[in-house]
A protein has these predicted regions:
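Structural preference for beta-strand elements that scaffold enzyme active sites
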Residues: 11-13, 90-93
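Glycine- and other small-residue-rich loops at beta-strand/loop junctions that grip anionic moieties
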Residues: 53, 81, 94
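Aromatic-lined glycan-binding groove of carbohydrate-active enzymes
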Residues: 1-40, 74
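Terminal-tail/helix-coil boundary detector
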Residues: 7, 31, 35-70, 85-89, ...
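Glycine/threonine-rich phosphate-binding loop and adjacent beta-strand/alpha-helix elements that clamp
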Residues: 78
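Residue-level "edge-of-site" marker
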Residues: 18, 81, 119
Length: 158
């Protein structure tokens, strides 16, 4: 879909660039996840750390935190910059519920990821990977090519 949208100049706004909160740092290994309230309360099967898919998410989050630290940004900023680095993406949904979340997301608006950082992310979660069965979908061959998923370095900013 993304190559087609790019070819015809159609805008793309990806859904859930922060992975339902997983890419904000809210859910980390060693921290208790409240399965009785909020999104985790509504969909505990997607947040219960005792389930293998969610345990895997926690492992991946920790690896991505390391990439964010190496890049000099927060996990939230890494995730948002990753999404807008794709040449077919017009904008990213930010979806803050609080002023604190809005302030944090806006503070990362100028974060631009270099190719090494994008490669590190791809190595942790290869393109088209669905960590949780509920996220499963079809992977078109075009997303396996890094150059199709990245704006030129000078055009990656907001």
């Amino acid at each position: 879909m993304l190559p087609t949208c790019e070819r015809y100049g159609m805008g793309v706004i990806p859904w859930s660039p922060l992975g339902g909160g997983w890419l904000t740092g809210k859910y980390r290994r060693g921290q208790e996840i409240d399965l009785t309230s909020g999104r985790a309360g509504r969909m505990p099967q997607r947040f219960d750390p005792s389930l293998p898919g969610n345990a895997r998410k926690l492992e991946l989050v920790e690896q991505l935190v390391g990439v964010a630290e190496q890049a000099g940004c927060s996990l939230t900023h890494l995730a948002m910059a990753f999404v807008v680095a794709h040449p077919a993406v017009s904008a990213a949904i930010i979806g803050p519920r609080t002023m604190e979340q809005l302030t944090d997301i806006l503070a990362g608006a100028d974060v631009v990821l270099d190719d090494a950082t994008l490669d590190a992310i791809d190595a942790i979660v290869p393109p088209g990977t669905n960590v949780h069965v509920d996220d499963a979908g079809w992977q078109p061959p075009a997303i396996a090519q890094a150059w199709r998923r990245r704006r030129p370095i000078g055009t990656r900013g907001a």
